[in-house]
Amino acid sequence: VSWNENVTYKYKSLYKVTTETELQEVIAKSEKIRIFGTKQSSADIASGLETLIDITSYNKILSYNDVEHKVTVQSGVILGDLLEAIEAKGWCIPCLPDINTITIGGALATGTHGTSGNLLCEYMTDCSMVLADGSLKRINQKDELIDAVRVSLGVLGVMSEITFKCEPIYTLHVKE
């Protein structure tokens, strides 16, 4: 059931993945899949009668690049957890939605936007995507698919690992 109880999830199989290899294996053996995380969508985009893959345990922060201010995470990382981790490094992502309980993969795939008027996905520089056959495709800013992948609703594949370019943290001031 979704957070607001308007979407009920019915499925044939449910898998809770914790590694990229598990994600690849489930996708490779499944005919139709839907990915879900914290069930924050009011739409039924993640519901269906096929295989559901829960990515909420696929939630590790994998690496930091202190020189380039980049962080790489698994797609099930919760936005609030990512923000807390990069804030400790003095970094931020300057485009944030008003909700921080969503998964990074879900936020990107659905075009989440925020405070700066930009899309969160504009700060994604690289990612790996699991394709329908279970193979892995690495995509970076030089790849012609990068913009399509950024807001793909899962049509092109399932985002696995995602790298964000962060900025130095700053303070907002309100003038009235």
Task: List PLM regions with ranges.
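Hydrophobic alpha-helical segments, principally membrane-spanning helices and signal/leader peptides
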Residues: N4, G90-W91, I139, I146
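Glycine-rich N-terminal segment of FAD-binding domains in flavoprotein oxidoreductases
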Residues: E5-D98, G111-S116
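Residue-level marker of motif borders
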Residues: L14, I33-R34, V71, T101, ...
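Secondary-structure junction/capping motif
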Residues: I78, T103-I104, L119
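Extended alpha-helical targeting/anchoring segments
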Residues: N100-T103, A109
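FAD-binding subdomain of flavoenzyme oxidoreductases
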Residues: A107-E176
